[in-house]
């Protein structure tokens, strides 16, 4: 609450000094975002407020897709791609435009033959990183002929996990670019990370780590097949058997390719 109010007054001071025509703020469903919108509209109704959705959304997010009174709603919503544009259009009356995302990657297929390598992509939370790492180490023990590349989120300090990773010879901590990792891996193990869209677009086969009695945070939501979920380390064997005879679900590929679009700067110019 204190941080919300501090941000409120900091942005208020900047707006009074700069007097912008357009204010672009993040749109993740936080209370402070609505406070900023209300403040701007009270200060000067001629200032346009554009709210930009740039992160993954899940089935359990309500605040971001729930319109409030007009004074708390943005004048325009900018999205990362087609998927979220459609969802916002179903809920809001204001214009919704695709701005795109720096996470957008052109669809390509690596010429490097991908064999027996898993890419693990946790979110920027210690609990999620630790959970995925423990799962990875357990799976690595029962699949000694496979290699596992653990890629910490850029906001996490990977040093905290080096000692654990060093205990298992076939698990390595990534120090390469995400493109390098995507080019050499065949599978991607994930929970709520947006990087899974890039991975699937580059041909990696997705494996979701489900946790008993906890909310499902799979970014693919209802289109993801339960047959590609793992709960226990031993479940990895059924996944490998499944992918021996099955290709990635086409709905998953289409969803990945449409979640992030290329950045379109003309959208911003059109608002000025």
Please annotate each region the language model reported.
Residues 1-102, 196:
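Active-site and donor-binding regions of nucleotide-sugar-utilizing enzymes
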Residues 21-24, 76, 117, 147, ...:
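Structural motif
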Residues 32-33, 58-61, 84-88, 106-107, ...:
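Short, charged/polar "capping" segments at the starts of alpha-helices
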Residues 92-98, 162-167, 194-259:
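Catalytic binding pocket for nucleotide-activated donors in carbohydrate/polymer assembly enzymes
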Residues 94-164:
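Conserved catalytic-core segment of nucleotide-activated headgroup transferases in glycan assembly
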Residues 100, 169-176:
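Active-site donor-binding acidic/aromatic loop of nucleotide-activated sugar
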Residues 183-191:
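Acidic donor-binding loop of glycosyltransferase active sites
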Residues 258-272:
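C-terminal alpha-helical cap of glycosyltransferases
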């Amino acid at each position: 609450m204190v941080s919300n109010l501090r941000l409120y007054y900091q942005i208020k001071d900047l707006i009074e000094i700069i007097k912008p025509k357009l204010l672009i703020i993040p749109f993740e469903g936080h209370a402070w975002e609505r406070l900023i919108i209300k403040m701007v509209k009270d200060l000067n109704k001629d200032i346009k407020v554009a709210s930009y959705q740039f992160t993954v959304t899940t089935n359990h997010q309500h605040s971001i897709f729930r319109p409030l009174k007009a004074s708390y709603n943005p004048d325009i919503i900018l999205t990362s791609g087609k998927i979220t544009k459609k969802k916002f259009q179903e809920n809001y009356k204001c214009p919704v435009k695709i701005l795109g995302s720096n996470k957008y990657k052109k669809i390509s297929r690596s010429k490097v033959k991908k064999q027996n390598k898993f890419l693990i992509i946790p979110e920027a939370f210690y609990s999620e990183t630790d959970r995925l790492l423990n799962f990875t180490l357990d799976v690595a023990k029962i699949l000694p002929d496979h290699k596992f590349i653990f890629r910490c989120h850029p906001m996490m300090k990977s040093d905290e996990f080096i000692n654990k990773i060093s205990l298992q010879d076939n698990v390595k901590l990534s120090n390469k670019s995400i493109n390098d990792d995507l080019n050499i891996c065949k599978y991607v193990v994930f929970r709520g990370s947006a990087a899974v869209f890039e991975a699937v677009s580059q041909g990696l086969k997705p494996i979701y780590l489900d946790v008993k009695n906890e909310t499902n945070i799979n970014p693919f939501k209802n289109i993801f097949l339960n047959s590609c979920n793992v709960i226990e380390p031993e479940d990895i064997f059924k996944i490998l058997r499944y992918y021996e005879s099955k290709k990635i679900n086409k709905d998953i590929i289409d969803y990945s390719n449409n979640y992030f679009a290329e950045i379109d700067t003309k959208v911003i110019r059109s608002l000025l």
